[in-house]
């Protein structure tokens, strides 16, 4: 070590009053100054490329500390630190000491002593105290004869026994989609929170936003009943569980719903790196989920610009479990591969997957089923078994009440299309399908569409998810009224990630949205029956999900590879398809140059439209597509000889559809 460096180190020790070996102090100086951050990041990225591996944030921090010399080196990465870099770091620290001696001294002291303080052990003890007497995973296995009332009442009873931010899995065996849908929606609207200040400050605006949307809808009569329904809906924040995933077995007999419990908890959470409760907690990564920022000036994790460590309860617990390295937390690689997609094959491993993927070693698991079983120790978890609650009547959710009131006030005035093309085998109209359907002469025996997804495309922007559902409700009601009495409506939709903006309009409302189940609710309110749900397996889709190779609880999440194709009917009918998993690729709309060769952002394939053919009972009647888009439904009708009607609101897409149909 050069004389200049030694001199500066001595000066640091004199100013701070810290007496530490130079070989121990220098790595701390380098770490706090962050002069090597970019070079270390580049080195780690090169290491990942060479070895074709992925690293978690904890693993990157471990390597960084080794390269800086803070901890004993275990990797083979070569990394030399020059005297110039050391001098630069020392100059930055000395400059910082001149400006804020107390703050910088505290950071150096904390960094030097962090190794001797076993905060991980302390924090693990703290977590165990918080979770004592509670479950960290709830699994409910629903047999065919178990009613939705029993399931919902059981969920309500077990809710308070489940630790916050932890998971619930519901396994359905030969259960109809109608029941699954009702249970899922009840899970998200289980309770009401009245003390969430971020919502309380904007309640008036949220009520006004929805009221204005309803008032401006020409197909809805806004009256006192809707005013009262809006007031009731926004009487607090609906909460309970947040939807994560829906697994479907490839034989369609088994489905698995995954939810995470999220409720408001304002309890101060100590910093995981210094155990200080001197924290700030005014941030919410998700609605009702609070995060904190450490304000301890001596915390070893303070950033170069003085920001404290940011953290929330579940991320701290997961990182701590990862650091502890308990082998019981290692997920079997073959098991992770088997559930890599949300369409799976082997139902024999469901219990193992749920317990090892959605809980940690040492957690308590509550397993509800109709079968009586004894307590077991399973993959390092304590598993207790229980039965169902009685099937008391379940009240409608506030969402159901709101949408039902909207439906009661739908009054559509027919109007002529802006332009139209009518041929022997098809007709296409430009305008709003709700208003045009009352004017067209064609009789409709069936309908099929892929509706605009809530805020998933540039042409489908609604202020909130509720506003989107209102529009879809009105259009579905108009189609129900126009269809013949034995009419069928095939509806293709997938669950997406997006900001629902229902209670808070910001990034914190970003989550997985159950568009499929919300659509089922709409159709059920109108009077449709769910005949079947064909699962469109889109194969290997691109996804950031499950990109980790860390086979560790809550890191392993499935790739969403399917969409729903619901078959709704006006009268109860027997299903037409014995095989309900449909495999065909999505439309390729982008060429090798990155150009959109179809001109539409969300075209759907001809193979999907062909699924409607068995439901066409009268070949003199027409098949409707109320959201025609690029014209695929009409093109398919021409090719396979059935009559079609297409309606498109967007004039640009109407022109695109017209051109494609003429060229087909």
Annotate each language-model stretch with its function.
Residues 1-655:
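Core catalytic lobe of class I
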């Amino acid at each position: 070590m050069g004389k200049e460096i030694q001199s500066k180190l001595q000066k640091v020790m004199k100013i701070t009053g810290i007496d530490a070996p130079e070989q121990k102090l220098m790595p701390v100086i380098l770490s706090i100054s962050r002069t090597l951050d970019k070079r270390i990041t580049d080195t780690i990225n090169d290491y990942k490329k060479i070895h074709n591996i992925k690293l978690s944030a904890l693993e990157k921090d471990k390597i960084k500390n080794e390269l800086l010399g803070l901890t004993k080196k275990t990797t083979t990465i070569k990394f030399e630190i020059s005297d110039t870099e050391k001098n630069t770091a020392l100059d930055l620290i000395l400059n910082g000491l001149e400006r804020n001696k107390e703050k910088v001294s505290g950071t150096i002291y904390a960094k030097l002593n962090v190794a001797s303080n076993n905060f991980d052990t302390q924090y693990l003890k703290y977590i165990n105290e918080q979770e004592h007497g509670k479950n960290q995973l709830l699994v409910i296995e629903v047999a065919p004869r178990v009613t939705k009332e029993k399931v919902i009442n059981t969920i309500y009873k077990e809710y308070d026994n489940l630790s916050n931010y932890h998971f619930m899995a519901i396994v359905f065996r030969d259960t109809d989609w109608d029941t699954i849908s009702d249970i899922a929606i009840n899970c998200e609207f289980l309770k009401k929170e009245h003390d969430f200040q971020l919502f309380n400050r904007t309640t008036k605006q949220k009520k006004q936003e929805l009221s204005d949307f309803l008032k401006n809808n020409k197909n809805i009569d806004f009256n006192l009943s809707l005013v009262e329904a809006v007031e009731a809906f926004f009487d607090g924040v609906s909460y309970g569980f947040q939807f994560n995933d829906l697994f479907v077995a490839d034989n369609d007999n088994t489905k698995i719903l995954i939810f995470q419990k999220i409720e408001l908890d304002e309890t101060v959470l100590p910093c995981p790196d210094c155990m200080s409760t001197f924290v700030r907690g005014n941030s919410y990564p998700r609605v009702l989920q609070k995060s904190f920022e450490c304000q301890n000036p001596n915390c070893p994790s303070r950033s170069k610009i003085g920001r404290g460590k940011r953290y929330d309860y579940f991320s701290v617990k997961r990182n701590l479990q990862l650091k502890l390295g308990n082998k019981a937390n290692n997920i079997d690689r073959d098991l992770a591969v088997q559930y890599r997609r949300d369409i799976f094959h082997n139902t024999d491993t469901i219990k193992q997957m749920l317990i090892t993927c959605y809980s940690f070693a040492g957690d308590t698991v509550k397993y509800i089923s109709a079968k009586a079983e004894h307590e077991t120790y399973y993959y390092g978890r304590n598993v207790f078994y229980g039965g169902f609650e009685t099937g008391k009547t379940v009240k409608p959710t506030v969402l159901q009440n709101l949408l039902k009131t909207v439906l009661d006030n739908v009054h559509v005035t027919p109007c002529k299309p802006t332009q139209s093309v009518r041929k022997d085998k098809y007709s296409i109209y430009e305008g709003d399908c709700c208003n045009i359907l009352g004017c067209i002469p064609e009789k409709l025996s069936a309908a099929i569409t892929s509706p605009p997804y809530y805020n998933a495309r540039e042409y489908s922007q609604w202020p909130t998810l509720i506003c989107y559902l209102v529009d879809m409700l009105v259009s579905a009601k108009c189609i129900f009224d126009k269809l013949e009495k034995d009419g069928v409506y095939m509806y293709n939709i997938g669950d997406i990630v997006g900001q629902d903006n229902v209670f808070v309009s910001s990034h914190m409302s970003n989550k997985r949205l159950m568009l499929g189940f919300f659509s089922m609710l709409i159709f059920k309110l109108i009077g449709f029956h769910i005949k079947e749900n064909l699962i469109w397996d889109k194969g290997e889709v691109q996804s950031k999900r499950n990109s980790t190779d860390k086979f560790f609880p809550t890191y392993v999440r499935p790739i969403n590879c399917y969409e729903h194709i619901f078959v709704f009917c006006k009268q109860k009918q027997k299903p037409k398809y014995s095989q309900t998993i449909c495999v065909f690729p999505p439309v390729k709309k982008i060429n090798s140059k990155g150009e959109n060769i179809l001109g539409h952002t969300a075209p759907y394939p001809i193979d999907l439209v062909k699924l409607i053919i068995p439901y066409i009972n009268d070949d003199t009647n027409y098949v409707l597509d109320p959201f025609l888009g690029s014209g695929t439904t009409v093109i398919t009708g021409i090719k396979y000889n059935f009559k079609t009607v297409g309606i498109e609101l967007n004039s640009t897409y109407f022109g695109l559809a017209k051109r494609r149909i003429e060229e087909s």
